[in-house]
Amino acid sequence: VEDQTEIYNRSINEDTLRWWSEQSPEALEEAMGDNGRIPLKECMEILYKFCWNRRAVWSNGASFDCVVMEHAWRQTSDKPNPIPWQFWTMCDTRTLWEITGVSLKDGGHTTSHKAVEDAERQAIVVQKAYTKLIKAELVAPAR
C-alpha cells in the first residue's frame, strides 16, 4: 500500500478499509499481508502482458474491476496507451450469469474475498454459463 500512496499518490477509501476489517483473517492476510508482495508498477506490467490482445477480458462488473485496473495502469505506466484491452473486449460476468441463470454459488465454496479463489470460482461459473449457452445453441463453441 505504501508504494501506492507515496509514489503514485493513490488514495485509501475509509469505506474500503472498514469493509476489509470485516473480512476473514485469511482473506485479510492474503490481501494486506507482506507475503511476497511486489511493487504496484511491476504487478501492473505483469498483468499488462497477460491481458494484452486478449479476445475478451472478464470482470465481475465492468464498471468496477476494469476501471480500477485502468486507473492503476495510467498512474504507473510509461506507455502512451497503458491499457492492454479495447473497450469492446470487456465482458461482465454479472450479465452472463443473469441471462443463463447461473450464480457464484455454482462455482463451489471458497474463502470469501481471497483473490485467487474468487477468480477461480468466477472462471468456473463463466464456463458453466457458456456451456448452457452452447447447449442451447445460442453461441458457437470457441475455436
Predicted regions and their residues:
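Conserved non-catalytic scaffold segment of RNase H-like nuclease domains
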Residues: 1-59
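Pocket-edge positions in alpha/beta enzyme catalytic cores
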Residues: 35, 88, 111-114
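Residue-level signal for well-ordered alpha-helical scaffold segments within enzymatic catalytic domains
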Residues: 46-50, 67, 71, 98, ...
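Substrate-recognition/cap helix-loop segment adjacent to the acidic, metal-dependent catalytic center
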Residues: 48, 63-88
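Alpha-helix capping at helix-to-loop junctions
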Residues: 53-56, 74-78, 96, 102, ...
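Acidic, Mg2+-coordinating catalytic module of metal-dependent nucleases/exonucleases
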Residues: 56-63, 67-68, 104-143
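Short, flexible loop segments at boundaries between secondary-structure elements
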Residues: 82-105
